[in-house]
Amino acid sequence: MKKMFILFVFCGLLSCKEKKNESFTAQQIVDKAIGISGGDLFVDCKLSFDFRDKHYISEGIGNNAVLKRVFDLEGKKVEDIKSKSKFERYVDGTLEVLQDTVANNYDNSVNSVHYFVKLPYGLNDPAVNKTLLKEVNLKGKEYYKIKVTFDQKGGGEDFEDTYFYWINKESFKTDYLAYDFHVDGGGVRFRKAYNERYIKGIRFVDYENYQPKDSTSTIENIDAKFELGDLELLSKIELKNISVQK
């Protein structure tokens, strides 16, 4: 009996050690992160929410998605509609004629808000390239650090931007993200997720949005800068009145 007990304890310790040393690819980590955030529940659902002074609506996923933004402008109702093939703006129900550059700016603005709200779901899009980097410790917790770049084909207007995601090793939840951008002089942003809530099985978070205090910060070392307190809070990204309909 004593030998059996010792064998049982040994097997248990071995199992824990193997689990602790279990390794995953970038794809496997992202798949788990998407799964814990709602997975296929994103498909074919109608999602609406308020962000700042605008109302957003999305129906469908991927190439079949229709993304909307509705807001008041000087007493007039503005409705922006982005689909796979076009972008349209209606003002009080009348279609506006827009220059291509203006339409592209509006299109990107609508897409960006919807994209961040649904993260990490979009990380399995065909144009996304994922690389697993060295694991890091942030605020006492261990994280997988994943670098994301985009192919020019299918990567959108901002395909040259680079993203980093910090996915918790225990929960597989995306707690931090960062990205660089090249418009308006360029820069780097670092976001910390908070106020997690699940609505009909889908995970939603708000973000604290940070920027570097000096020019020595890059997207590669932004996590170390955050750990040292060398970032400053720029804004908060808060979602309100979230609704999920199947």
Q: Where do the PLM segments sit?
A:
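Sec-dependent N-terminal signal peptides
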Residues: 4-13
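Mid-chain, structured segments of secreted extracytoplasmic proteins
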Residues: 68-103
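Extended lipid/amphipathic-ligand handling interfaces
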Residues: 33, 58-62, 194-196
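Flexible, processing/modification-adjacent segments and terminal tails
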Residues: 21-25, 90-157, 181-184, 238, ...
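Positively charged n-region of N-terminal signal peptides that target proteins for export
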Residues: 1-4, 18
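Short, hydrophobic/aromatic-rich segments at coil-to-beta transitions
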Residues: 42-48, 63-69, 140-147, 174-176, ...
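Gly/Pro-enriched, hydrophobic low-complexity segments
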Residues: 144-242
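N-terminal leader/targeting segments and the immediate start of mature chains
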Residues: 15-53
